[in-house]
Regions:
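Short acidic active-site motifs
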Residues: 33-36, 157-160, 206-210
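Short, structured loop/turn "capping" segments at alpha-beta junctions
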Residues: 127-130, 158, 197
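Acidic catalytic cores of enzymes that act on phosphate-bearing nucleotides/polynucleotides
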Residues: 165-232
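Glycine-rich phosphate-binding loops that contact phosphosugars or nucleotide phosphates
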Residues: 1-142, 176, 211, 216-271, ...
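Long, charged amphipathic helices and adjacent flexible linkers at domain junctions
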Residues: 136-140, 146-155
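Conserved phosphate/anionic-ligand binding catalytic regions in large, soluble enzymes, centered on
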Residues: 13-14, 183-185, 189-192, 279, ...
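Short gly/ser/thr-rich secondary-structure transition/capping motifs
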Residues: 24-32, 152-156, 200-205
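A short, well-structured juxtamembrane/interface segment
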Residues: 150-167
Length: 283
């Protein structure tokens, strides 16, 4: 799967579940990196996603794939776009109109499109049963159904913390595990919409030197989905509160009794958590 920006993040978000159901290695790559690579498996399928359908790098990546004899699928959310002519097959991300430049529906819609594509292929190849297919769709729907409530809770949380957040000029977003893609996409959304200095890091990578630059003027946003690193990210937050006196905000399922934290009863289905934890950073 190749794509830039939101398209890449959507591919990364879908990757693990696609690998699981397809029982094969799945890669998410920036198009320009893929274009310059040299060693490939000859039985490769390349899915090139460009939401607006005009990404020159995604088109170049698809052309590279075709030149190597690979199967290609051109994906876009807008019909009649140039990218359609560079794939053997067209696959539309059917989300309707995106009314703002920064993609929101496009991110979630692309994740769902990648996943359902994988479910259908896996079912056809008898790698999953019809019951498993139906269960994946049911769980996906349950996760997506919570999105409006998450958005409403986020708006209330923002109004509570608006005065503090308006002072922010340097923000770090920290994430991990199944919501790594949400951290990356959330960082991009804040850059595009708020337009001040923001950086995003995977939890362990952040601990390799970056933490040295945190001080009392730094704002920290922790994307705290359930999982094996949940306690570790809470310890990191406590350290910065006690030692660096930074401004700290959690996105979490667990009641912290702290008005700075966005607490919501996320369904926390680990395979579909990416559909939920991104919403606060989109709003």
């Amino acid at each position: 799967m190749i794509g830039s920006g939101t398209s890449y993040h959507a591919a990364l978000a879908a990757k693990n579940l696609m690998e699981k159901v397809l029982q094969m290695k799945v890669f998410a790559s920036y198009p320009i990196v893929f274009k310059d690579e040299r060693i490939f498996n000859k039985n490769t399928l390349v899915m090139g996603l460009s939401h607006a359908g005009m990404s020159a790098s995604t088109i170049a990546g698809l052309d590279k794939a075709k030149a190597n004899g690979f199967g290609t699928i051109a994906m876009t959310a807008e019909k009649g776009r140039p990218v359609e002519h560079h794939g053997d097959v067209k696959l539309y991300v059917d989300i309707g109109e995106e009314k703002a430049g920064p993609k929101t529906k496009g991110y979630i819609g692309s994740i769902v499109t990648f996943m359902i594509f994988a479910f259908k292929v896996a079912l056809r190849q008898e790698k999953i049963t019809q019951d498993e297919f139906d269960d994946y769709l049911r769980r996906m729907q349950a996760s997506a159904d919570a999105i409006p409530d998450i958005a409403e809770a986020t708006s209330k949380w923002y109004l509570q913390n608006r005065n503090d957040l308006m002072k922010c000029r340097r923000l770090y977003v920290i994430g991990y595990d199944n919501c790594l893609a949400d951290m990356m996409e959330g960082t991009l959304k804040i850059c595009e919409a708020v337009r001040y200095s923001v950086q995003g890091f995977e939890l362990e990578e952040f601990m390799h030197g970056i933490y040295h630059c945190i001080d009392e003027d730094t704002y920290m946003l922790y994307v705290c989905s359930k999982g094996q690193y949940y306690d570790r990210i809470l310890r990191l937050k406590r350290y910065f509160e006690e030692e660096r006196h930074s401004h700290n905000f959690l996105i979490t399922h667990e009641n912290t009794n702290n008005s700075k934290d966005l607490v919501f009863p996320f369904t926390d289905d680990q395979e579909f958590a990416v559909l939920q934890y991104i919403v606060p950073m989109q709003v």
